[in-house]
Swiss-Prot record:
This is Protein translocase subunit SecA. GO terms for cellular component: cell envelope Sec protein transport complex; cytosol; plasma membrane. Its cofactor is Zn(2+). PANTHER family: CHLOROPLAST PROTEIN-TRANSPORTING ATPASE (PTHR30612:SF0), SECA INNER MEMBRANE COMPONENT OF SEC PROTEIN SECRETION SYSTEM (PTHR30612). PROSITE patterns: SECA, SECA_MOTOR_DEAD. The keyword Protein biosynthesis does not apply. It comes from Actinobacillus pleuropneumoniae serotype 7 (strain AP76). Keywords: ATP-binding, Cell inner membrane, Cell membrane, Cytoplasm, Membrane, Metal-binding, Nucleotide-binding, Protein transport, Translocase, Translocation, Transport, Zinc. Zn(2+) binds at C886, C888, C897, H898. Monomer and homodimer. Part of the essential Sec protein translocation apparatus which comprises SecA, SecYEG and auxiliary proteins SecDF-YajC and YidC.
Amino acid sequence: MISKIITSIFGSSNDRTLKRLRKRVAQINKLEPAFEKLTDEELQAKTAEFKQRLADGASLDSLLHEAFATVREASRRVMGMRHFDVQLIGGMVLTNRNIAEMRTGEGKTLTATLPCYLNALTGKGVHVVTVNDYLARRDAETNRPLFEFLGLSVAVNVPGLPNEVKREAYKADITYSTNSELGFDYLRDNLAHAKEDRFQRELHYALVDEVDSILIDEARTPLIISGPAEDATQIYQAIDTIIPHLVQQDKEDTEEYTGEGDFTLDLKNKQAHLTERGMVKVEGILTEMGLMQEGETLYHPVRIALLHHVYAALRAHKLFELNVDYIVKDGEVVIIDEHTGRTMAGRRWSDGLHQAIEAKEKVNIQGENQTVASITYQNYFRLYEKLAGMTGTADTEAFEFQQIYGLDTIVIPTNKPVIRDDRTDLMFKSEPEKFAAIIKDIQECMARQQPVLVGTASVEKSELLSAELTKAGIAHNVLNAKFHAQEAEIVAEAGAPGAVTIATNMAGRGTDIVLGGNWKAEIAKLENPTEEQIEAIKAAWKERYDIVMKAGGLHIIGTERHESRRIDNQLRGRSGRQGDPGSSRFYLSLDDALMRIYLNEGKLNMMRKAFSEEGEAMESKLLTKVIASAQAKVEAHNFDGRKNLLQYDDVANEQRKAIYEQRNYLLETEDISAMIETIRGDVFNRVIDQFIPPQSIEEMWDVAGLEEALKRQFGMELPIQHWLEQENDLHEETLRERIIDIATQEYHAKEEKVGSEVMRNFEKGVMLQNLDELWKEHLSAMDYLRKGIHLRGYAQKDPKQEYKKESFEMFTNMLDLLKSNVISVLSRIQVRSQEEIEEAQRQQETMAQAESENYRTADHQAEAQQSESLTEEQLANLDIGRNDPCPCGSGKKYKHCHGSKARYA
């Protein structure tokens, strides 16, 4: 209450920011008349002028007014579009570490040209990040003429590009790319074995389009590059047959309650748990299958992997649904993004879940993979020196953007007031009643030729509603994961009079729905259209536009509330763009997932009793509060999950940074011999310490053990016992120095044989190979630690602190092992000089020649003996198989000896 009073007096933080930025807009507008008078050449020369001023010490902020005026005037000349004042405000917000909330249709693509141009002047590169390939290509081609007019290069980076093309794309001033490709390229760069193989420059400025989708919805999805692991295909198939025999139980067993079922489900967290009864049942079936021994349990250390497979199969069957969480396409299981409704080709669930679903759907089971490199979007985008984002819906997540990314959210006012009619929700008792009401609403819209966009939460629901519309004889388009390729075409037609379009979540997001249909898309379909054709298309569109405007603009129907208010707002935001009319309404039922999972049974029963007759709709403020309460619970739960993930990933992130910095140092540095010398001293000292403790007396020494260790690990045979017997003044320190000196001398002797350049390259190769292999194993070990660390809570220990402590110990152990492995390989390697190699080659050639002469001599002798012992006539009379030994005694098969002669005869 007090905060509202203060806000009403002083204005909100957002209002104060906008007030300050409007003053700067006035400064930019003052420059406009002067910039309009510039010739094209003078306007283009501004880019070089700005770059020189930056080089002379000017700041980007000091150039902002002139730079924005330059872009606005260039855009007017090249693209026929002049930036509105609110777009200038958006551009200023995006220049710094902020998120701009701009409503759908307010021109985010054009707004982005302002901060992109300004930040590209530094020459460090700008990355414009989009959610899919189509938008990356579209936005790049849309803005390319403007940027190239101003002397900046533009490139697109999408999956499947040849390495050289990708490398050039990153050298461009402005690179349009998808979020996943940027992350994967970063990981690939940190797996490269030569600096020339890397793609990215230093990460300078990223402008993320649909920032909420990328930094929040996909925040929990790690980017993973993996390699093949142990194959367990047959186990997945065997365990898949067990699940149909198991019975679900409503709630967990307790001291007071023991159920009759085999497993319970946690729908909120998508987890499954075996009951005590279920555990015994599964163990019995596995024993019958021969996968376990009689008397063994699933918690036996040897069998714990089987339990992992059982839980993966349970989740696959009971918690992941076809056409909701995934589709089967061309014999492969393809994940559906729960937030966008789009398929995520190439992505796979981890922990054996994907293989379990493949077994369930009876498709080819692909092998499990081991993580080679991974990073979350949260940590990848925090690597950029400057990060900004834009979206139509960010204000509801402003707290999370600030907490996790340090980004402030500024709501940009619309150019024209929003006049969309957002109607109150209608609640129905069951889903069939809800669908009947939706169909009635659609029919009413079609009668007045008003276009309708129907938003659904899953592919399954979109197909179910599509079937109902088909039954009712209503023509419509479906936009979901199965029809991803037709996305742009379907969206282009969605604003036509009487058009009905069903879309999952925010499929089609990023593409405006133009009232009356998209006339530009119609023209694009024609080859070399004439002026008459273009004018005819525009005239036809104007007629359709007028019809739609009269009917009330685009009508949005939500078939259920989403887990987040933000996604509901995104759906609503498709209508009422740029001051157009429009309307929206959500239709709900007590069967909806949000109601079932997040409202308790008592509230649901109370609401069921409120319905007196079939088909009755309920709308009230209480209903709105109940729904808002459920969504708030989900948002809080999801935020906690993302924050928790980040806290754990931050531990791994510090280690990742250290490893990747070391890796980049190795790639950039030509000579690492000084590092090798230091490591050699550390490794030998550590080995010697095990057998001869520092400052210890001779009776405590294990000399034989030290001799054996040096031989085994470094290939060094040293008579240490003999030295000690012969030299009375040899003590612990001098002995240590002698061993390390001999190791160093032997290594330098090898270097003299092959040359320093060869040895330097070999050192780098050994270091990189061992670093990559051990890092891969470390990631796997960290993953195992992460999965089980929550159990420390039962011992009254903080799991996060325990994870930090143990992961640090694992990391230091890995580094120690890396040093040992590298020195061991370098010490044991046998090298030969060029003269020795040439001599060895000469000896091999001589031996080969001698062997060849011996074979020829032996053949001649054998033939002579054969001709003496058996005549051709005698051999021809014998009944000999072609593969039998020749009776002449040569030892060859008959077909290769006298058999061949007989055949030719």
